[in-house]
From Swiss-Prot:
It catalyses: tRNA(Met) + L-methionine + ATP = L-methionyl-tRNA(Met) + AMP + diphosphate. GO terms for cellular component: aminoacyl-tRNA synthetase multienzyme complex; cytosol. Binds 1 zinc ion per subunit. Keywords: Aminoacyl-tRNA synthetase, ATP-binding, Cytoplasm, Ligase, Metal-binding, Nucleotide-binding, Protein biosynthesis, RNA-binding, tRNA-binding, Zinc. This is Methionine--tRNA ligase. It comes from the Archaea. It is found in: Cytoplasm. Pfam families: Anticodon_3, tRNA-synt_1g, tRNA_bind. It comes from Methanocella arvoryzae (strain DSM 22066 / NBRC 105507 / MRE50). One of its GO terms (molecular function) is ATP binding.
Length: 683
């Protein structure tokens, strides 16, 4: 069913709006950000090349507790912090060829006004109600502790969690007051629990709607499958926070709207700002018959496939037509991590060292399918670029244009049926796979076309043919330059600056390439004055890659030293109060043996395990260790289980216990030194 939905064709007669998940204005841009924005930019460029009316908007996410905490640490205002990173992101995107029709800011007046309007509409339609809830409060700091101001224990899976999300364990969204054993993140003190009135959105009333909606959503399978699981157990959603920074809740100046309400509303506000500047009507996209497509990271599927469509439905806006969720990025086969040094900063680690943005665009787009994880290492980057862009694509363009220039040939002729067929195959691949969000297949088709060109050039040996049969040689070169023209057009969405260089070397105005249409790749090249060709790509040398690898290695070592120092401090100061032997005796620890294990659909972290505890039948226990252990590795392992933990549901799957693991550089299962029978008590 998903495959049928993804085969929907472009262009269509409806306007298309493409958005990207908003970068959080709390730190600099890294390549993990580009995993979303570069594919979205390629998608937009391709649609336009196919004649599709398309608008492309994004902006900085300016609200939420992390920004307030960071601003306090730097002794500046939240707006000053946001402005600093807003400018950085805007600059990085432009340098990398990600060109939005509008790049806005959720703290700007348009978003404040649109957010208040939508919240008021939800209230008017009966989807919002007040409720007194228990919230964390720090008596030491004398402040409320919303969201990431507080840390504690997840009530569902017992993992360490932050106030609004169990990001380490079961990945659930947590409502204010749900977290157990809350502690202030600012001073480390134990938090008090106080009662306060907040406002809730009736998300629980949208269950049937969401189930039906998700079945019609033109989304990547990872987005739909993940959201389907969550749609089965909806709870009403607290949409206010007691903060000073943010969009004020209508009629209650002491509260602000939760950041995950006003952030996606930014998509609408940015469209309004674009439309005003362009003399268009924003309602054609947000209240008319349009196709709205969100490009997001895999970590914010819940918000875009559950919260957001329910809000839009409740307020009477057009629903998203598609959600495109990317895989993550690993660095050196390690989980992307700032604290552990496995990170690549776009400006400091890439652009500042002279690497062309198009190389990174190509690597991200061509490495693997969009929903799968990318691994970035400097050696893999070097190998892929040198083999494909330098060795095939760039080599073909250079040898053809250099040969023609050196011989002073006027290229004229007719297109060889084999060449027109190869070009048409590449065109058809673009037209088919863009609707499937299969950007790698499109990149592969471009390299295949350049390989066809290299083979054609080499097999016809124009350096000999020019002496033996000049007319035949001219026709061969005409077909070669036709492929070069096709490559420039078809690769513009992937490597826009390099494609423009080719376009200029063909004698066209580089600025006109963006207005070329995909079928122009088959329009015969008309001979024209051409400038002297220049080298398109240069080989990435071992010395340069070794230099970049050294920078990465040193960063990882420094991060490890810092983490080890922090661990030592934590060991000197126990974080939890001492317990009595009676407290410990309340836990029933038993030896278990894993007899079956499988991944939970829609989750990257969770495994569903069947554990033999010496009982009549095995226990089903959910564990958050899928990033460290595969299901195959789990089967047969002896583990330690808390057997009397209250049953709970995690992503709709019942869990009857907890498998114990040590958390150091990834979870490590606890086991016994000598063989023990399943069910043996641990004392």
């Amino acid at each position: 069913m998903i495959e049928e939905k993804l085969m929907s064709e472009f262009p269509c007669d409806k306007p298309v709006l493409v958005t990207c998940g908003l970068p959080y204005a709390n730190g600099s841009a890294h390549i993990g950000h580009l995993r979303t924005y570069i594919p979205a930019d390629m998608f937009v460029r391709t649609l336009r090349m196919m004649g599709q009316e398309t608008v492309f908007v994004c902006g900085s996410d300016a609200h939420g507790t992390p920004i307030i905490v960071n601003a306090e640490e730097q002794k500046i205002s939240p707006r000053q912090l946001v402005d600093k990173y807003h400018v950085q992101f805007d600059s990085i995107f432009k340098k990398c060829g990600v060109i939005f029709d509008r790049y806005g800011n959720t703290d700007d007046p348009t978003n404040h006004a649109r957010t208040k309007s939508i919240v008021s509409e939800l209230q008017k339609n009966g989807y919002v109600y007040p409720k007194e809830i228990k919230v964390a409060y720090c008596p030491q700091c004398q402040r409320g502790l919303p969201d990431r101001y507080v840390e504690g224990v997840c009530p569902y899976c017992s993992s360490i969690a932050r106030g609004d999300e169990c990001d380490i364990g079961c990945q659930r969204h947590l409502e204010p007051g749900e977290i157990l054993d809350p502690k202030c993140k600012v001073c480390g003190s134990k938090a008090e629990v106080r009662t306060q009135e907040h406002f809730f959105f009736k998300l629980s009333e949208f269950g049937d709607f969401l189930q039906e909606y998700l079945n019609t959503l033109h989304a990547t399978p990872n987005a739909v499958n993940y959201a389907m699981e969550w749609a089965k157990e909806l709870k009403d959603w607290c949409i206010t926070r007691n903060l000073e920074w943010g969009v004020k809740y209508p009629g209650h100046e002491d509260l602000v709207v939760y950041v995950w309400v006003d952030a996606p509303i930014g998509y609408i506000a940015f469209t309004e700002e674009y439309a005003k500047a362009a003399g268009k009507n924003w309602e054609d996209l947000w209240k008319g018959d349009s196709r709205i497509i969100h490009f997001i990271g895999g970590d914010i599927i819940y918000h875009h496939c559950i919260f957001w469509p329910a809000m839009l439905k409740g307020a009477g806006y057009t629903l998203p037509w598609g959600v495109v969720a990317s895989g993550m990025i690993k660095v050196n086969d390690k989980k992307f991590s700032k604290s552990r040094g496995y990170i690549v900063w776009v400006e400091d680690d890439y652009l500042a060292h002279g690497f062309h943005p198009d190389l990174l665009r190509y690597y991200i787009l061509s490495y693997t399918s969009h929903t799968k994880d990318i691994n970035f290492s400097w050696t893999e980057f070097q190998t892929k670029i040198n083999k494909e862009l330098v060795g095939s694509y760039g080599n073909f363009v250079n040898r053809v244009l250099t040969f023609i220039d050196s011989k002073g040939i006027d290229v004229k002729g007719t297109i060889d049926p084999k060449i027109s067929s190869a070009i048409k195959t590449a065109i058809d691949m673009v037209k088919t796979e863009i609707g499937n969000y299969e950007f790698k297949k499109i990149c592969d088709s471009i390299i295949t076309l350049s390989d066809v060109g290299n083979t054609y050039f080499q097999s016809h040996e124009p350096w000999k043919l020019i002496k033996e049969n000049p007319a035949a040689c001219e026709n061969v070169l005409f077909n070669c330059i036709q492929i070069v023209k096709a490559l420039a057009i078809l690769s513009e969405p992937t490597v826009p600056e390099k494609a423009k260089e080719i376009w200029g070397m063909l004698g066209y105005d580089p600025a006109t390439l963006a207005s070329a249409r995909i079928d122009d790749a088959l329009v015969p090249y008309e001979n024209r004055p051409r400038p002297k060709p220049s080298i398109l790509f240069t080989k990435l040398e071992d010395k340069k890659i070794a230099e970049m690898t050294k920078i990465m290695d040193e960063r990882v070592k420094a991060a490890e030293a810092k983490l080890n120092g922090k661990k030592a401090e934590e060991e000197l100061e126990p974080q939890l109060p001492p317990i009595t032997i009676d407290d410990f005796a309340k836990m029933e620890l038993r030896v278990g043996k894993v007899i079956a294990s499988e991944k939970i659909k829609g989750s990257k972290k969770l495994l569903k395990n069947l554990i033999d505890l010496g009982e009549d039948k095995p226990r089903q226990i959910v564990s958050g260790i899928a990033e460290v252990y595969t299901p195959e590795e789990m089967v047969g392992k002896t583990v330690i289980v808390i057997a009397n933990l209250k049953p709970t549901k995690i992503m709709g799957v019942e869990s009857n216990g907890m498998i114990l693991a040590a958390d150091s550089n990834g979870a490590t299962l606890l086991t016994v030194e000598k063989p023990s029978e399943p069910g043996t008590k641990v004392r």
